[in-house]
């Protein structure tokens, strides 16, 4: 684990500096400057990666899994993100009870806006289809480009540091590091505005569960680019469940809440069973390989 401490010091240090600046200036995450700063934080793992490579006198951007040979796992990873979102919608409906409605205020506004733009009545399934299709295209383009800033670190440089260790233990470690890295922004209201302190621990769980999915597809595809596409697409569709709510609970609802935990567990278990009984590679229980 060469230079792991340096990598963590840089990636964590930069986001705490950014979060501290937002806090001291009273800049909210829902403001334009706040959005710009929060989005820029996604570059910090890449910066940490490049600094570590420079210190080690390694070629920059090498050995972090940048491979452009497309295989079926590129598409599997990309399309899994709407599946996770759909599962999260189902579990949100289960947890939310009367708070869940197909006539919620947000959904009604979306439907009215689309009806006016397209000059036709759009059914509920049409709104969902529009949301997922636009999310898929955002995920494979601008969102993937931004998400690469994180994935070059988490599923690139950091994955390499854990190479040779047990896949699942590496996923837990990398996921926990990734989730905790968000702490400064979580404390400022990102993802869990109602429960910022509890949200820090919730985000660690999200990070671990999501890492099992990202890391498995990263290994199967052989490319960190796929992880960036998955991350970008996930960000685009993760909050879809929230449009069905008249009143939300950030610890329960959507991909960041318990509904998301359940959705990720379903997908994670499905991948584990596929790995164990279909391909019989047993990646989940084997030493990690890029």
Q: Model-predicted segments: where are they?
A:
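N-terminal membrane topogenic signal
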Residues: 1-10
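Aromatic-anchored segments of alpha-helical transmembrane domains
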Residues: 12-20, 82-90, 176-185, 232-242
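Juxtamembrane/transmembrane-helix boundary motifs at the membrane-water interface
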Residues: 16-38, 188-196, 240-255
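Membrane-helix interface linkers and caps
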Residues: 23, 31, 40-85, 91-113, ...
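C-terminal membrane module of polytopic membrane proteins
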Residues: 54, 196-198, 222, 230-290
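Hydrophobic alpha-helical transmembrane segments
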Residues: 116-143, 258-260
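Membrane-interface helix/loop boundary segments of multi-pass membrane proteins
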Residues: 147-177, 219-223
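Membrane-helix boundary elements
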Residues: 175-199
